[in-house]
């Protein structure tokens, strides 16, 4: 199998070049390098070329030379990198990463399962992790978008895969993370920004709801969403005990979610900053007062996670959840746009939150105060994500400052 030694005892290849320790040449001309990996196992690598400058034999598949491979192996051995990425595939790596993420919220857990299901169906998921290069990672994300996945969906997928590969780097399974690049430089951001609506549109929307025979019963709830900036999960989680009419405050310390299996659960607020006490304006106070006065007492108060007395119940006596309100908003917009020539843009509970934040910013509210009211852990979110200020807003503010107002 191996090239024999010469008179001096030095092993040579068929071109009479001296072979180093561990190197050999097979009878078919292919070179081999034998070494012991970090696990104490004997391994072999092969190449048709000894040096980078060697000519590739006719009909053979191109590959880097044996000595180039040796350099990479020696470097990995020196740095304690596990050979071949521990023979782990992308799917196995992501699964291992997800299994270590214990105690996460149910929405996060559902997101992890979705990512694993996607990777399971992709050939990329069967690739060995040490074989994945940045160009492979980019190509896969581009493929996902061509397959019809949205930017936000791909952003979520990468949000799981990238830290999984970082775990592999930290575990010395691979040397570099192939997903360390900006997503926007690879695929087109086709996501639609959820814009705040104007004050005029807000007034028209609320007026329409108030005067509509069917939707009027939701007016107070919708008004509160527009005037408090509450997350819809926080709003539907409010109970009678959370509404302090005497001190005119709203105690926000949890949220209500319904899982895909229709299980109702109480969770902590989205962030620590989400736990807050909000003051009521006079009109918000009146809305809460009417909600409590008009709330029909059910035969049996539902209890979710130790909480009872939810403000809005559905026809089955269960607490209303985000989906109920999203449907109400959808139907309101559809009916409005069937009646009026000037169309109302898409309004959702989250648009109410955007609109509240934008209106407060335009009114000159202190950013730290606004951050508290919104329940943002990072003021950058308050300033960059939720405030949609136009040129006209900037012009008005500049004139106000210039006039010393």
What spans do the regions from the language model cover?
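Short, Arg/Lys-rich segments that mark the N-terminal edge of DNA/RNA- and chromatin-recognition modules
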Residues: 1-51, 254
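N-terminal DNA-binding module of tyrosine recombinases/phage integrases
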Residues: 26-31, 37-135, 293-307
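Conserved tyrosine-mediated DNA breakage-rejoining catalytic core shared by Y-recombinases
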Residues: 184, 238-296, 303
């Amino acid at each position: 199998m191996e090239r024999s030694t010469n008179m001096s005892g030095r092993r040579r290849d068929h071109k009479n070049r001296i072979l180093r320790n561990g190197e050999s040449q097979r009878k078919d001309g292919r070179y081999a390098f034998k070494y012991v990996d970090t696990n104490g196992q004997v391994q072999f690598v092969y190449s048709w070329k000894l040096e980078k400058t060697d000519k590739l034999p006719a009909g053979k598949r191109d590959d880097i030379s044996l000595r180039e491979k040796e350099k990479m192996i020696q470097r990995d051995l020196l740095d304690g990198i596990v050979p071949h990425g521990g023979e782990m595939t992308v799917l196995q790596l992501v699964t291992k990463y997800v299994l270590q993420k214990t105690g996460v919220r149910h929405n996060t857990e559902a997101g992890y399962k979705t990512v694993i299901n996607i990777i399971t169906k992709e050939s990329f998921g069967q690739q060995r992790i040490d074989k994945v290069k940045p160009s492979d990672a980019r190509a896969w994300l581009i493929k996902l978008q061509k397959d019809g996945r949205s930017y936000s969906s791909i952003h979520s997928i990468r949000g799981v895969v990238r830290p999984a590969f970082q775990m592999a780097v930290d575990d010395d399974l691979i040397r570099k993370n192939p997903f360390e690049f900006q997503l926007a430089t690879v695929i087109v951001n086709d996501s639609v920004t959820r814009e705040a609506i104007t004050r005029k549109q807000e007034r028209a929307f609320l007026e329409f709801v108030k005067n509509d025979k069917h939707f009027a019963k939701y007016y107070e709830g919708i008004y509160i969403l527009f005037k408090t900036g509450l997350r819809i999960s926080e709003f539907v989680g409010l109970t009678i005990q959370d509404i302090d009419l005497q001190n005119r405050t709203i105690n926000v310390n949890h949220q209500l979610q319904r899982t895909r299996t229709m299980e109702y659960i109480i969770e902590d607020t989205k962030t620590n900053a989400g736990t807050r006490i909000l003051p009521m304006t006079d009109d918000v106070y009146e809305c809460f007062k009417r909600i409590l006065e008009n709330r029909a007492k059910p035969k049996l108060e539902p209890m979710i996670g130790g909480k009872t007395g939810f403000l809005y119940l559905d026809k089955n006596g269960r607490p209303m959840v985000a989906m109920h309100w999203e449907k109400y908003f959808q139907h309101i917009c559809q009916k409005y746009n069937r009646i009026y020539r000037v169309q109302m843009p898409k309004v959702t509970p989250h648009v109410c939150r955007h609109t509240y934040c934008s209106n407060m910013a335009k009114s000159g509210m202190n950013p730290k105060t606004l951050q508290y009211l919104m329940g943002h852990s990072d003021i950058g979110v308050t300033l960059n994500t939720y405030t949609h200020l136009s040129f006209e807003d900037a012009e008005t503010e500049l004139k106000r400052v210039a006039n010393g107002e």
